[in-house]
From Swiss-Prot:
Function: Member of the two-component regulatory system NodV/NodW probably involved in the regulation of the transcription of genes involved in the nodulation process. NodV may function as a membrane-associated protein kinase that phosphorylates NodW in response to environmental signals.
TM region positions: 16-36, 37-57, 60-80, 88-108, 155-175
Subcellular compartments: Cell inner membrane
Catalytic class of the enzyme: transferase
Species assigned in the record: Bradyrhizobium diazoefficiens (strain JCM 10833 / BCRC 13528 / IAM 13628 / NBRC 14792 / USDA 110)
Gene: nodV
Highest taxon of the lineage: Bacteria
Keywords per UniProt: ATP-binding, Cell inner membrane, Cell membrane, Kinase, Membrane, Nodulation, Nucleotide-binding, Phosphoprotein, Repeat, Transferase, Transmembrane, Transmembrane helix, Two-component regulatory system
Protein name: Nodulation protein V
SMART domains: HATPase_c, HisKA, PAC, PAS
Listed GO MF terms: ATP binding; histidine phosphotransfer kinase activity; phosphorelay sensor kinase activity
Domain Histidine kinase: 669-885
Chief subcellular location: membrane
Length: 889
């Protein structure tokens, strides 16, 4: 076979080689090549073509080449004879090299052919082995599991493509690496221990769940099935088949997180879940349900436990609802109370739905929510509403809202009905209300409202009278403002009605008192001009023996007093017996006395007050002869003191009425300050129920809503406390006060007034001010009066910002000083000295008593109030109060 193949190759080799030699010959002849160069060219052709065929063909080409070399290039030309002896070695060398070269090449070709045949056989064997390996590799690669083969040191010997690609590697990247590198670092010790267990029990399968780490750092869960076996040379290896259980684990973890979140949500929202199989009686309670009912977690839940924990007053209704739900197989929802072992009470809202299990059994699934906090918030809300109603009742102020289009009330508080003499519980028509308004006042009231609507007055006021069913007259002062709708037109009027009957009566009483006071002052002045002291003398028996003639001439004392005892002419024996007992004891002891004051009557029978002092006198032997002394008619002084007390009382009543009136004028602000937190409480309570009613309650939002409810309730309570304090009529209570805190309290009350008048309040309060001794309510009244005056003074200001400045400081004399500065129209120079006087006012309405009352209050506190001239527009009122003694020390 080899010879035939060699012969087949010799013919084309010889033919092509001859053609090549001819071409080389022509080329060398053409270029007149040297003998040696031609020999080298022929040698290359012979050796080149010896690669194609047999040694015989190569030898033939060699002979042809020598003949051509001798014939064409060795002299003589065209002859086979070689004359030049120098060419003979070249020919010999050519022959040796070509023969040896072709032989070696032929030998090499034989060896290559033998190697090729052997390789073909080996290739066929390898192909068979490869086919078998491919079949096993296909099984290994296409198995839907990750396969690893590792040695006893944990080095990866083999891994299928799925095992590598699942981890984001190429197979070559894992071979030779430690299998522990593909496991999560926290799990490597566990895997090492599992591999060691497999090596200890060769042939025994082991299974475990563990986490692996992909090349990109992501984690997947796998279930490892591993078994150790003996490999070549009895060397142990571990075969590991891995199943990806990431989704299953994620589902399990998600379920665990969901259960944990549900448990936290139930704990935060105080909502427990439960289920109850109506057929088997089996029940399930969540942990929060056990906590709500305060029952041990080890206790088997049952409906009877609910009945036992239920408040005795609610037990019958709860049992009835459960029985009806069982009988009719229907959903149920109800609220009831729990009476816990510690005596506390909880309010529970429970609801359940009827479902069917996979086996078709009836089961109730529901939730029980602890709504105790919500119930308490509702109670607080109702209390706040009651506080608002009480505040309006105390100040005799009602609030209302009037729809301009329907020309009827949208809202009116119960106090409005009371002001008109109606029962708030009974419906009242608009015509009935109008019938109570005094006929003389109704047209004017309607005209004021019409002008406010037409001219869109932001704020307007008016007064009218109400005729009560008993015929009495109640005077009402109303403050209101317009509300502009989205269409730019007035849609609503909102305002307040204030009962100022007491204020009006107090004003009349004050005017009458002032008239009487002037008459009394004139009368006392006449008394003072005509009265004088007189001398008197009594005997040993203390009877009057002598009076100066002036008393009779002036008619100071009644006639016929001689011979009477002093207590016989006194008119206050029964009123002050102790005073007279002590005086008689002094006389019996013959001791001097001073400034005994008693009441008697003058010649006209009118009561007078006498102040007398006396001294005993004796004869030369020391015998007691009686008393001599001097008396003074102090009726004018006593009556002046009494008049001053009456005046102070009238001023106190006027101050109280002014406070109440100020509160009435600020009712819109106060109502806003109270209704704003009340509305927030309602909104937050509604939001809380909404958060709780979701399929998955939003506990964080519900908790925030409850916290906001508490904050708003506290804010409303603080506002009402301040209103009650200002409206209260009581004695002056002098206590150490922080004047800055008093300013802050007032700022909270007048916030709405500032907003409605577009006034900005700026406070510059000195820090660490010493305390003053004063009555909080009266000082609040002073500051409110100054602030309200400042606000009203800026109503006409349109060319600059309306700003009110309150400053506190200490002056050089050690007084705490407070000033209120506005940027209004200011005070005329000729009015500055009179602005603090009673009944002086620059307003179109009012008595002019506000600043006078402020001065009286400040002076009672030992302070002073004044008007400070300022360069710019507006006015500054300033008052200073002495420090509290403890602050001085």
């Amino acid at each position: 076979m080899y010879r035939i193949s060699s012969f087949k190759r010799s013919a084309p080799q010889l033919t092509l080689g001859s053609i090549a030699l001819a071409a080389v010959t022509l080329t060398c002849v053409y270029f007149q090549a040297h003998f040696a160069a031609a020999a080298f060219a022929y040698l290359l052709v012979v050796l080149l073509f010896s690669l194609m065929g047999s040694f015989i063909a190569s030898s033939a080409l060699c002979i042809v080449a020598i003949a051509a070399l001798a014939y064409y290039f060795a002299p003589p030309a065209f002859s086979l004879r070689i004359d030049d002896p120098r060419d003979v070695p070249v020919v010999v060398a050519f022959l040796i090299v070509s023969v040896v070269g072709t032989y070696l090449i032929g030998k090499l070709r034989q060896e290559r052919e033998a190697a090729r045949v052997a390789a073909a056989k080996l290739q066929r064997s390898a192909s068979d082995l490869e086919d078998r390996e491919k079949r096993w590799r296909a099984i290994f690669e296409h198995n839907p599991a990750m396969y690893f083969m590792v040695d006893e040191a944990g080095i990866v010997l083999n891994v299928n493509t799925l095992g590598a690609t699942q981890l984001g590697f190429a197979c070559a990247e894992l071979l030779g690496q430690s299998v522990l590198d593909v496991f999560l670092e926290e799990d490597r010790a566990f895997v090492r221990k599992c591999i060691q267990t497999c090596l200890e029990d060769v042939g025994q399968s082991r299974t475990w769940d563990v986490r692996k780490v992909r090349k990109d750092g992501s984690v997947l869960w796998v279930r490892e099935n591993a078994k150790a076996m003996l490999w070549a040379g009895d060397r142990p290896v571990i075969l590991m088949a891995c199943e990806d259980i990431t989704e299953r684990k994620q589902t399990e973890l998600a379920l665990q997180r969901s259960e944990a979140h549900l448990a936290h949500a139930q704990e935060l929202s105080h909502t427990g879940s439960f289920s109850w199989n109506a057929s088997t009686g089996e029940a399930f309670w969540s942990k929060e349900t056990f906590r709500i009912f305060q029952i041990d977690l080890q206790t088997t839940p049952a409906p009877q436990l609910v009945i036992e924990r239920t408040h005795p007053d609610d037990r019958a209704s709860v049992k009835e609802i459960i029985d009806e739900a069982m009988r009719d197989l229907r959903d149920f929802e109800h609220e009831y109370r729990l009476l816990l072992p510690d005596g506390s009470v909880k309010h529970i809202h429970a609801q359940a739905r009827v479902t069917r299990t996979a086996s078709g059994e009836i089961e109730f699934v529901g939730a029980a929510t602890d709504i105790t906090a919500a119930r308490r918030a509702e109670q607080q809300l109702r209390r706040s509403e009651a506080y608002l109603a009480e505040a309006q009742h105390l100040t005799h102020t009602g609030s209302w809202s009037w729809d301009v289009h329907t020309r009827d009330f949208v809202y009116r508080s119960a106090e409005v009905d009371r002001l008109f003499g109606f029962n708030p519980q009974e419906p009242v028509s608009l015509e009935t209300i109008r019938s109570r308004i005094h006929p003389e006042d109704l047209p004017g009231l309607q005209e004021v409202q019409r002008q406010a609507i037409d001219q869109e007055h932001e704020r307007f006021e008016y007064d009218f009278r109400v005729i009560l069913p008993d015929g009495g007259i109640r005077r009402i002062h109303s403050v209101a403002h317009v509300v502009v709708g989205s269409d730019g037109n007035v849609s609503e009027l909102i305002g307040t009605h204030m009962d100022v009957t007491e204020q009006h009566a107090a004003r009349e009483r004050l005017e009458n008192t002032l008239v009487a006071l002037r008459e009394s002052e004139q009368r006392f002045r006449d008394y003072a001009e005509t009265a004088s002291d007189w001398l008197w003398e009594t005997g040993p028996d203390h009877r009057v023996t002598h009076l100066s003639e002036h008393t009779s001439a002036a008619g100071i004392l009644a006639t016929g007093l001689t011979g009477l005892l002093r207590w016989d002419i006194a008119c206050d024996m029964e009123e002050e017996p102790e005073k007279w007992r002590q005086h008689r004891a002094t006389l019996q002891a013959h001791l001097p006395f001073r400034d005994l004051i008693y009441r008697t009557v003058n010649r006209m029978g009118s009561p007078i007050y006498v102040r007398t002092s006396g001294k005993p006198f004796f004869d030369g032997n020391g015998n007691f002869l009686g008393y001599r002394g001097v008396s003074t008619d102090i009726t004018a002084t006593i009556r002046a003191d009494q008049a001053e007390q009456e005046l102070r009382k009238a001023q106190a009543e006027l101050a109280h009425v002014t406070r109440v009136t100020t509160l009435g004028e600020m009712t819109t602000s106060i109502a806003h300050e109270i209704t704003q937190p009340l509305a927030a409480i309602l909104s937050n309570a509604d939001a809380c129920l909404g958060w709780m009613a979701r399929d998955v309650p939003n506990l964080a939002a519900a908790r925030s809503s409850v916290e906001w409810i508490i904050e708003d309730a506290i804010r409303a309570s603080e506002v009402i406390r301040s209103i009650r304090a200002l409206a209260k009529k009581g004695e002056i209570e002098m206590v150490p006060l922080d004047i800055n805190q008093v300013v802050r309290d007032v700022s909270a009350l007048v916030t709405r007034e500032l907003v409605s008048h577009q006034v900005t309040l700026r406070s510059e309060l000195a820090s660490a001010l010493p305390r003053v001794l004063g009555d909080r309510i009266q000082l609040q009244q002073v500051i409110i009066n100054l602030v309200m005056n400042g606000i009203e003074a800026m109503d006409a200001v349109t060319d600059r910002p309306r700003e009110l400045l309150i400053q506190s400081s200490t002056d050089d004399l050690g007084y705490v000083q407070l000033s209120v500065t506005d940027c209004g129209v200011g005070i005329a120079e000729n009015d500055a000295d009179r602005v603090l006087d009673p009944f002086f006012t620059t307003k179109s309405s009012g008595l002019g008593m506000g600043l006078s009352i402020c001065r009286s209050i400040v002076e009672v506190h030992g302070g002073r109030i004044s008007v400070v001239q300022k360069n710019g527009p507006g006015a500054t009122f300033q008052f200073a109060l002495p420090l509290h003694k403890e602050a001085i020390s």
